[in-house]
Amino acid sequence: MPEKDTGGQHRATRRTEEHDETIDEATATSDVQERREKLDADVDAILDEIDDVLEENAEEFVRSYIQKGGE
């Protein structure tokens, strides 16, 4: 099958696609970084909440655990 002469347009399209892929990868990397930072902040908040609960209830928890273990 004879190929149609595109006058070099195919090559330009390929470069454009490669450029678009590079931009897409940069955007994806940025999105991933933002998501990671948000998840890190969420995890830190949860751990802080757990620490607060343990500070308030740790002594009671230990007493009930020891009492149950000693029965």
Curated annotation (Swiss-Prot):
Pfam families reported for this sequence: Pup
Region (ARC ATPase binding) location: 27-65
Coiled-coil residue spans: 30-59
Region (Disordered): 1-36
Domain comment quoted from the record: The N-terminal unstructured half of Pup provides a signal required to initiate unfolding and degradation by the proteasome but is not needed for pupylation, while the C-terminal helical half of Pup interacts with ARC to target proteins to the proteasome.
Function description: Protein modifier that is covalently attached to lysine residues of substrate proteins, thereby targeting them for proteasomal degradation. The tagging system is termed pupylation.
Keywords, in A-Z order: Coiled coil, Isopeptide bond, Ubl conjugation pathway
Biased composition annotated in UniProt, kind: Basic and acidic residues: 1-18
Gene Ontology biological-process entries: modification-dependent protein catabolic process; proteasomal protein catabolic process; protein pupylation
Domain of life: Bacteria
Family assignment from sequence similarity: Belongs to the prokaryotic ubiquitin-like protein family.
Covalent cross-link (Isoglutamyl lysine isopeptide (Glu-Lys) (interchain with K-? in acceptor proteins)), residues: 71
Subunit structure: Strongly interacts with the proteasome-associated ATPase ARC through a hydrophobic interface; the interacting region of Pup lies in its C-terminal half. There is one Pup binding site per ARC hexamer ring.
The keyword Coiled coil is assigned to this record: yes
The protein's name in its UniProt record: Prokaryotic ubiquitin-like protein Pup
Molecular-function GO terms, alphabetical: proteasome binding; protein tag activity
Keyword Secreted attached: no
Pathway: Protein degradation; proteasomal Pup-dependent pathway
